[in-house]
Each structure stands twice: as C-alpha cells, then as structure tokens.
Curated annotation (Swiss-Prot):
Coarse class of the protein's main subcellular location: membrane
A biological process from GO: proton motive force-driven plasma membrane ATP synthesis
UniProt protein name: ATP synthase gamma chain
GO MF term set: ATP binding; proton-transporting ATP synthase activity, rotational mechanism
Function: Produces ATP from ADP in the presence of a proton gradient across the membrane. The gamma chain is believed to be important in regulating ATPase activity and the flow of protons through the CF(0) complex.
PANTHER family the UniProt entry points to: ATP SYNTHASE GAMMA CHAIN (PTHR11693), ATP SYNTHASE SUBUNIT GAMMA, MITOCHONDRIAL (PTHR11693:SF22)
Similarity comment text for this entry: Belongs to the ATPase gamma chain family.
InterPro entries for the chain: ATP_synth_F1_ATPase_gsu (IPR035968), ATP_synth_F1_gsu (IPR000131), ATP_synth_F1_gsu_CS (IPR023632)
Amino acid sequence: MPGIKEIRTKIKSVQNTRKITKAMEMVAASKMRKAQERMRAGRPYATKVREIAAHLMQANPEYSHPYLVEREVKAVGVVLVTTDKGLCGGLNTNISRVTLSKLKEFEQRSIKVQATAFGNKGLGLLTRIGAKLVSQEVQLGDKPDLDRLLGAIKVQLDDYLEGRIDALYVATTRFVNTMKQEPVFLRLLPLSNGLDDPFQSGVETLAKTAEIKSDYSWDYIYEPDAKSVIDDLLQRYVEGLLYQAVAENMASEQSARMVAMKSASDNAKKVIGDLQLVYNKTRQAAITKEISEIVGGAAAV
C-alpha cells in the first residue's frame, strides 16, 4: 500500500488536472454557443438562395447547369473537414473511420480520388494514407474565414467544371444537438434534384427544402440574363454548403469538447474521492499502529 505522502501527492495532482479540465469545459461551453449561432446564421440565406435558384431553373428548363448534370463517375473529389486540435472525444476518429471506408469503396470501384483537407487532424490522416492532396487549409480558428475556405476549395470546383472529377463529396460532422454529433459523407456535386439540403437532419435543418411549383404565374426580370443569374446563384449555393460543412464541424467540435471535459472532470472528482478514502484508511491504520505500539510499550513497563 502506498504511503500517506504518496497518496497526498496523487490527490494534489488529480485536483490540479480537474481544475484544468473544468476550465476547458467552461471555455468550450462559451465557444459552443457562438459556434452554434454562426452555424444557424447562414440558414435564412441558404433558404432564400435555394428558393430563388429553384424558381429560376423551373422558369428556364432549357438551361442545364453543369452542377446539376449527372455523369459517369470515374474520378471524385473529397473534402475532409476535421478539427485542428484534439481533446474532443471521438469526433475525429468517427469521421476518419467513415472517410476511410468510403475511400476504400472508391478504390474497389477503380475511381480516382483527389482530396482537400480542412483541419490538422484530417490533413494528417490523408498524408498518412498517401492520398492525392490538391489543397489544404489548417488553423482556421474559432471563426472560419470564407475567403480562406473558398481559396482551398476552388481547385476542386474548377476540376469539376472542367471534367477532371465527376462528383464532389464532403466528409464532416453534422451537429444534431449538444450531446449528439453525427459523422456524414455527403455528395455536394452534382446537386440533387430540387436542391435538397444535404445537412437536413430531423428538426435540426439548415433550411426546409424549397417547394418547386410548376404553375408560376410570375417571373423575374433578369440582368444581364437568366443564365448568368443561375450560374452565380448555384456557385454561391455550393460555396454556402461548404461553409456550412465547416460551421457544422466547429459547432460539433466545441460540443464534443465540452462533453469530454465534463466527463474528465467528473472522473477526476471520482478518483479524488477514491484516493481520499485510501488516504483516510492509510492514515487511520498508521494512527492505530502508533497507539498499539504505545499501549504495548506501557504494558511492558
């Protein structure tokens, strides 16, 4: 059995660790609220862009944008969104497992893959497995910069438009609620019919799917023309979805970190209680031994 001094040192060490995890829990809780606000802030914008784009395409059926055209898949692009830091439970492990499974599936189907990494953890994974990296962006901070994100993803979008890849996927963690985050592997391009939102999940949706009516009795006046407007809207819509993928991951990261740090703090409290019990028993045993020695010495006299 360890001595009293050793136990006291262990208790002090665990107490110090608990202070750190408790502080990290509080910081993560604060960042989580801000991340959730940013995640939800883009929903009204995405809703309106989708509704207008759906209206334009319905009113101009003769024009088919490349983002909407299905084609034989021979090569794909994958955007992997992870965190820059750890200490967020199994968040990165779960999305990495899903991504590796999909990459293996593409390999079995002889489909070429080129990847973009957002976050140090994803970059490390793709580097280890020898994936073809065409762009990367790390150290995004707590508030993602749209220009940096679009700069990294532009090469994938250009390759899609020029036919070098036939589909674009994003692997990210979808925020469901504070206690639940879901790893998802979603196809962004080509866009699905009706411009469905790939981040829909029960009541936690980016926005409701726009209802496309076939009996429009009115239309917009387009400047300079409908084709240019559709091109710009769909480009912005796809960019918005990619931004949303990063925002969802950041909200999930802070939620997972808060839960992980709370669990660590609770476990530390339990360990302190167990160590305190051992300390008390050891101390009591030492006192009892000393009393026995005194009594034994007195009896001998």
